[in-house]
């Protein structure tokens, strides 16, 4: 991005494999699942399980899933993050805007080094996680904090969350209204957020409360009553208890109770990715169809102008 500004916005998303192949997916999962913020099991016990059991099993399965949603220009998460960054640069011409991934490429630390090489004096880091969690935002904070001593002359701020930001809430609400105008409105609106182990929430992680606040802010903006919507958590991993209600069983119960159509939105995801496109838009729709119900997926804000404008306002207030 061409700008002479000494202030930079660094947009950071979770990450993605470089290709929908087993080796690339295994490399990505190995990095992701080796983060102690993500899996807290001591490495002495976790590494043999990860490399001996989990990666050999999940690598091929995940690669097959990625292949279903891969775009001509790359993974949806990478494509939309790059385009969103370009949109942010257009609405923030007085800042230098770039992007990175917490896992995979472009690597976060390398992006920070690149900004230092440009002579940037102030960096605002914007994790693309509307709701804060120790498993996501804090992991980005860890990398930034480890990098700080190498560039003490640069002021670095990490935005913690924007779960109730008025501009972001309005953008989500507008995207839902637009979807209804184009595709019609279903009987029930479902909010599906990425799950979190219950033990993490019990330890004080504010994520579930922030998800609830996000959902409530959006339904308030839409003017919906309590019977018009439902929320749940998806992407459970492992055998332990995660945040409830679980999204998919909740949808099943509603369908078996007579609800025949659902609109579903994922306000915890800034950009569409494997979890939203394969697990939800394809997977949830398939299991609901088996129960005589339909699901209409509402895309993430992705690279929309309203998304860029909302995030630019968040960054400028940092």
UniProtKB/Swiss-Prot annotation:
Its main location: cytoplasm. InterPro entries: Ferrochelatase (IPR001015), Ferrochelatase_AS (IPR019772), Ferrochelatase_C (IPR033644), Ferrochelatase_N (IPR033659). Pathway: Porphyrin-containing compound metabolism; protoheme biosynthesis; protoheme from protoporphyrin-IX: step 1/1. Keywords: Cytoplasm, Heme biosynthesis, Iron, Lyase, Metal-binding, Porphyrin biosynthesis. GO terms for cellular component: cytoplasm. Its EC number is 4.98.1.1. Catalyzes the ferrous insertion into protoporphyrin IX. NCBIfam families: hemH. This is Ferrochelatase. The lineage of its organism: Bacteria, Pseudomonadati, Pseudomonadota, Gammaproteobacteria, Lysobacterales.
